[in-house]
Amino acid sequence: MENRYSVHPEQAKRFTTAELREHFLIESLFVENKLNMFYSHEDRVVIGGAVPVKESIALDAGDFLKTDYFLERREIGIVNVGKPGAVKVGDEEYVLEHKDFLYIGLGNKDVFFSSLNEGGAKFYFISATAHQKYPVQKASLSELPYDHLGEEASSNVRNLYKVIHADGIQSCQLMMGITFLEPNNTWNTMPAHVHDRRMEVYLYLDLAEDAKVFHFMGEPTETRHLVVGNEQAVISPAWSVHSGSGTSNYCFIWAMAGENYTFKDMDAVPMNVIR
């Protein structure tokens, strides 16, 4: 597991491009036959990828978390971003199709990731600290309601799925969902916002090899950008905007953790303020 320490905004605005990428971008999340994890000190979230090819992979942090097992004091949200796969929780196995979600609450000791049939499952997950146990729940993308948002004139027509949140799958503090931009639409989260009470992570998906998203971050009056490719994630501290525009349409998985569990708790940034 790799540490990603917190960064003060006064420090971040002086970073070079390389330093911004080193602290906030996760470039290589998915590695075959490996559990790859990043420990962000922004609200203590663990960002990870598991790509089981030859055999199943256990959810195990070794000695890093100083607990007897990964979910002893944590909860986790999982999305399969590859071909069909399964997550085994204790004696129960949950089959996840492409972009299906699974929530696993505190106290579940044995968790394993595996591929089905021809292989190719690819699991993305976010874990946050937890104080109460909630039941394991699966959400199939094909069965989920969504909010249709945006306008063609603003190039931001999109479908937003809220999955783990106060009115959906229950958790202690983790919130998670996915947003799909429609063809010929490229902007997400603009006008921008911040939420000083929780951090957020974006995982960008469905981008061609030569397509990129220009992800904007930083304080509203000190924005910077990261050039992001397919299956790369961005850590957004509570003080940072998180918005982007792509060279094509795409989708992104968003996940939040922190003090407030209200999805609409955000502070809008007027367009005449952002710099």
From Swiss-Prot:
<comment type="similarity">
    <text>Belongs to the KduI family.</text>
</comment>
<feature type="binding site">
    <location>
        <position position="200"/>
    </location>
    <ligand>
        <name>Zn(2+)</name>
    </ligand>
</feature>
<comment type="function">
    <text>Catalyzes the isomerization of 5-dehydro-4-deoxy-D-glucuronate to 3-deoxy-D-glycero-2,5-hexodiulosonate.</text>
</comment>
<dbReference type="GO" id="GO:0045490">
    <property type="term" value="P:pectin catabolic process"/>
</dbReference>
<keyword id="KW-0479">Metal-binding</keyword>
<feature type="binding site">
    <location>
        <position position="195"/>
    </location>
    <ligand>
        <name>Zn(2+)</name>
    </ligand>
</feature>
<feature type="binding site">
    <location>
        <position position="193"/>
    </location>
    <ligand>
        <name>Zn(2+)</name>
    </ligand>
</feature>
<dbReference type="Pfam" id="PF04962">
    <property type="entry name" value="KduI"/>
</dbReference>
<dbReference type="GO" id="GO:0008697">
    <property type="term" value="F:4-deoxy-L-threo-5-hexosulose-uronate ketol-isomerase activity"/>
</dbReference>
<comment type="pathway">
    <text>Glycan metabolism; pectin degradation; 2-dehydro-3-deoxy-D-gluconate from pectin: step 4/5.</text>
</comment>
<dbReference type="InterPro" id="IPR007045">
    <property type="entry name" value="KduI"/>
</dbReference>
<dbReference type="GO" id="GO:0008270">
    <property type="term" value="F:zinc ion binding"/>
</dbReference>
<dbReference type="InterPro" id="IPR014710">
    <property type="entry name" value="RmlC-like_jellyroll"/>
</dbReference>
<protein>
    <recommendedName>
        <fullName>4-deoxy-L-threo-5-hexosulose-uronate ketol-isomerase</fullName>
        <ecNumber>5.3.1.17</ecNumber>
    </recommendedName>
</protein>
<dbReference type="InterPro" id="IPR027449">
    <property type="entry name" value="KduI_N"/>
</dbReference>
<dbReference type="InterPro" id="IPR021120">
    <property type="entry name" value="KduI/IolB_isomerase"/>
</dbReference>
<keyword id="KW-0862">Zinc</keyword>
<dbReference type="InterPro" id="IPR011051">
    <property type="entry name" value="RmlC_Cupin_sf"/>
</dbReference>
<dbReference type="GO" id="GO:0019698">
    <property type="term" value="P:D-galacturonate catabolic process"/>
</dbReference>
<feature type="binding site">
    <location>
        <position position="242"/>
    </location>
    <ligand>
        <name>Zn(2+)</name>
    </ligand>
</feature>
<dbReference type="GO" id="GO:0042840">
    <property type="term" value="P:D-glucuronate catabolic process"/>
</dbReference>
<keyword id="KW-0413">Isomerase</keyword>
